[in-house]
Amino acid sequence: MLEFYGKRFESRLLLGTAQYPSPSILADAVRASLSRIVTVSLRRESGEARAGQDFWALIKALGVAVLPNTAGCHTPREAITTAHMAREVFGTNWIKLEVIGDTDTLQPDPFGLVEAARILCDESFEVFPYMNDDLIVAERLIEAGCKVLMPWGAPIGSGRGLNNPYALKTMRAHFPDIPLVVDAGIGVPSHAAAAMELGFDAVLINTAVAKAGDPAAMARAFALAVEAGRLAYEADPIEARDMASPSTPLLGKAFL
């Protein structure tokens, strides 16, 4: 069972709530995904606006846990301010910390991320840092107090899947006891299954579901892929080989 900061969840699929064609389609996708955690952007879903109130009512009706994020923040100060606002609006210490360093690739700023994470952890936030796949950055985030890491698979919204599976596999081996979530870049369910087969604890999907022709159907496909990938990992799959290995026994074969 998935566990973040002492809270346990049956589903290993986290779902973003941005870019859906309508609130009803979002609700259908969340239900189809079986996800128990959704991410929310405070900047987009202001609790003071009527639209924000309607959105918040929809999320509460779904009965899912909310993971607010600091999307769009480019400095530690900006991210910290947004995190405090999110805690007040959504009533949770959870925060998906994003400090963006490059506007073209939306690559996280590792230096600003670690700085903001250290301050927020000291202020009793439970931080989910969106990061690259660098082991040293991961070490610094853990030292800062993060108990979950969210390395990217590929740039946000790119749909490229896992750009560097070797780095992700290395991170899994290096941090066997830290919950790891592949965040960003997942395009199709097979990408999610591949991440889970590497031993990751969960994946976060947004654009691939929200922008699909049928978001609810795609959400269901991702739910099945995540489950299949996890089962495959737990089943201890065979290692890839460079040469063939016969699978049919020779017993009973006629020799001339």
From Swiss-Prot:
EC code: 2.8.1.10
InterPro entries in UniProt: Aldolase_TIM (IPR013785), Thiazole_synthase_ThiG (IPR033983), ThiG (IPR008867)
Its annotated pathway reads: Cofactor biosynthesis; thiamine diphosphate biosynthesis
GO molecular function per UniProt: thiazole synthase activity
> Which catalytic residues are annotated?
K96 (schiff-base intermediate with dxp)
Q: HAMAP family per the record?
A: ThiG (MF_00443)
Q: By its UniProt entry, which PANTHER family does this protein fall under? A: THIAZOLE SYNTHASE
Assembly, in brief, is:
Homotetramer. Forms heterodimers with either ThiH or ThiS.
What is the protein named? Thiazole synthase
Gene for this protein? thiG
